[in-house]
């Protein structure tokens, strides 16, 4: 009963998030966020709550990077991607969070890569649709990736699956970068 109650609560919360995102009523609170520390905290949180023996790690530049973002929404996106990767990565597998700066496109590219079961190429676009679940035996509402996509798009970015990665799945999303006033001079 407890598990079903939690799933129902999550479903209601997810449906409300989708509705607010689509109507433009979801508020974004932008601030300068130091990415290395923020991402390390997400990895720590994910490792603390994981129920499998997969290795979850951070692979990124160690120098601080300030990103103008809604840090809670960014955390929601990344935690969702990490948790999804955990659902499909067997014990002994690995999950990596990474980011790079694409100066040419003026965006940050985040990726969550796993060594799990992967996603068939003909199903890759489906995973971003509402209530779409490729595996009915895995818990979830089928709204997490739809929420990620809507949130990322509202933040000015996009999300996709790296079709060239064949050792599991790699989700990549872009986030616009904004220069700080001190950097513009």
Q: Could you tell me what each predicted segment is?
A:
Residues 144, 148:
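Short alpha-helical Gxxx[C/S/T] motif in the catalytic ATP-binding
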Residues 29-44, 75:
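A conserved beta-strand-to-alpha-helix junction within the catalytic ATP-binding
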């Amino acid at each position: 009963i407890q598990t079903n109650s939690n799933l129902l609560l999550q479903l209601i919360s997810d449906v409300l998030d989708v509705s607010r995102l689509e109507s433009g009523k979801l508020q974004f609170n932008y601030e300068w966020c130091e990415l290395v520390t923020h991402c390390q905290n997400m990895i720590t949180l994910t490792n603390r709550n994981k129920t499998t023996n997969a290795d979850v790690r951070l692979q990124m530049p160690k120098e601080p990077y300030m990103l103008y973002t809604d840090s809670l929404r960014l955390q929601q996106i990344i935690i969702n991607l990490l948790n999804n990767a955990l659902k499909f990565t067997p014990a002994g597998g690995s999950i990596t969070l990474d980011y790079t700066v694409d100066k040419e496109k003026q965006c940050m590219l985040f990726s969550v890569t796993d060594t799990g079961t992967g996603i068939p190429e003909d199903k890759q676009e489906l995973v971003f649709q509402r209530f779409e679940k490729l595996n009915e035996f895995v818990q979830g509402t089928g709204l997490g990736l739809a929420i990620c996509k809507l949130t990322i798009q509202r933040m000015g970015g996009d999300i996709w699956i790296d079709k060239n990665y064949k050792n599991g799945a790699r989700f990549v999303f872009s986030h616009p970068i904004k220069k700080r006033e001190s950097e513009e001079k």
